[in-house]
């Protein structure tokens, strides 16, 4: 198998070509068939999270151990020299790079992962989320889940609903979809949480067909994928949040006219934007999607740390 991403930083989904994304996705299927392997034998990977995480951190850790590797690091900065002694972020990354074969970074500030890659002494850096900017490994597992359920990544009708303004998963996924052919994206959000202009510019440049809508009812008969994200309460005042959130809650009744092949994806965690009653429908795929994060992250780590696969 040709390895396109050996020793490569993965900071933005735009760092990966369509060919590279497809390569990772195809490789991920092999890990779903056989999760335990030795691709990361004798490899040490640093997990440096300065922002809360459950699925991303634990799936990365599981991916490392299942592939024979070892991980070190921290899940917050409270007991590090960053917090206690005022050490700079770039010094922290520079030192950590001396101990490991790869560094996985999550940070609340946009651009932090890119900065880490500039001070990692040629040790590959993976962005596990930087502010409202990018979350490339989540996007690849989203694409994997779409291909797994639809059998393709082209010629699809995809609705994205919720927080389009601040959600890094939405920003990454929208850019990734633009690399594939003849997809149409239906964006559904409150006007206060609309897609950033730079994402719209990318879609325009790539000639992606897209439209904006006020409710899921407008598009439910057309779509193959419904990607829903939580409204980020921490970004809004309480009254604004309550008003917006109440309008974007997906219920089982909203799916009455859905196509049989529709699958609902969610990067999780959810708040109340996705009713628990939806979990029992044939459309729900977000828990399988979360599981797929394990296999995709095994494929990514194995690829960047092995010249030959």
Curated annotation (Swiss-Prot):
> Is the keyword Transferase assigned to this protein?
yes
Alphabetical list of Gene3D superfamilies matching this protein: Aspartate/ornithine carbamoyltransferase
According to UniProt, this protein's pathway is:
Pyrimidine metabolism; UMP biosynthesis via de novo pathway; (S)-dihydroorotate from bicarbonate: step 2/3
Annotated residues that bind L-aspartate are located at 85, 168, 230
Q: Example GO molecular function term?
A: amino acid binding
What InterPro entries does this protein's entry cite?
Answer: Asp/Orn_carbamoyltranf_P-bd (IPR006132), Asp/Orn_carbamoylTrfase (IPR006130), Asp/Orn_carbamoylTrfase_sf (IPR036901), Asp_carbamoyltransf (IPR002082), Asp_carbamoyltransf_Asp/Orn-bd (IPR006131)
Give the PANTHER family listed for this entry. Answer: ASPARTATE CARBAMOYLTRANSFERASE, ORNITHINE CARBAMOYLTRANSFERASE, MITOCHONDRIAL
**Summary of the function given for this chain in its UniProt record:** Catalyzes the condensation of carbamoyl phosphate and aspartate to form carbamoyl aspartate and inorganic phosphate, the committed step in the de novo pyrimidine nucleotide biosynthesis pathway.
NCBIfam families assigned to the protein according to its UniProt record, in alphabetical order: asp_carb_tr, PRK00856.1
Q: What is this protein called?
A: Aspartate carbamoyltransferase catalytic subunit
Q: Which organism is the protein's source? A: Wigglesworthia glossinidia brevipalpis
The gene is pyrB
